[in-house]
Regions:
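N-terminal auxiliary segments of SAM/dcSAM-dependent transferases
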Residues: 1-22
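Amphipathic alpha-helical segments within well-ordered protein domains
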Residues: 11-16, 29, 49, 98
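A short, structure-level motif marking secondary-structure boundaries and short turns
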Residues: 12-15, 32-34, 82-83
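Conserved SAM-binding loop and adjacent beta-strand
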Residues: 17-20, 33-47, 53
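Short, basic/glycine-rich phosphate-binding loops at helix/coil junctions
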Residues: 25-31
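S-adenosylmethionine/decaboxylated-SAM
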Residues: 42-167
Length: 167
């Protein structure tokens, strides 16, 4: 199956540009590219904001912090009382994300940045306590992340697997 059959470049461009990202989300994506960190597309960040808003998400788990672009997009849609728990083994990326959150005046009680192997860390999170789980991590571990997400999500919660069709 050819890529053109799935979505031509004009359609993809239109979809990506239809809803512009807020400046701070765009800046975090640019920081990711500069740092050599995989950066989410505008379409991904817009979809995350939409999902968090529709769910009125108060508790979100993000597996794969990156430079904070996806976290910022989630905060755009989350409840003002919401808490983002973001897990990543790369402390440096988390420091960049933390600064991005602070630059947006997101109070520290609204985010938890946990450094460590995600599959080990999620074992310590509460069952059925989260509205949304975003997995943006090592693709070869997605099967295990899905199993953990099933445990973490409340009834009606949403699992997002970024780049699930990557291969």
């Amino acid at each position: 199956m050819s890529e053109a059959f799935l979505l031509d470049k004009r359609s993809l461009g239109y979809a990506e540009d239809y809803v512009p990202a807020p400046d701070h989300v765009r800046a975090a994506r640019e920081d990711a590219v500069s740092a050599g960190v995989p950066a989410p597309s505008n379409g991904v960040t817009t979809a995350l904001t939409f999902l968090a808003k529709v769910l009125d998400a108060k508790a979100v788990v993000e597996i794969g912090t990156g430079t904070g672009a996806t976290g910022l997009a989630l905060f755009e849609g989350m409840s003002p009382q919401g808490v983002l728990t973001s897990i990543d083994p790369e402390v440096g990326w988390q420091l960049t994300a933390k600064q991005a959150f602070r630059d947006r005046q997101i109070a520290s009680q609204h985010f938890r940045l946990i450094a460590g192997r995600p599959l080990e860390v999620v074992n310590n999170l509460r069952d059925a306590a989260y509205d949304l789980v975003l997995v943006n991590a090592e693709k070869l571990e997605y099967v295990e992340h899905v199993a953990q997400a099933e445990r973490l999500l409340r009834p009606g919660g949403v699992l997002v697997l970024n780049d699930a069709l990557w291969h």
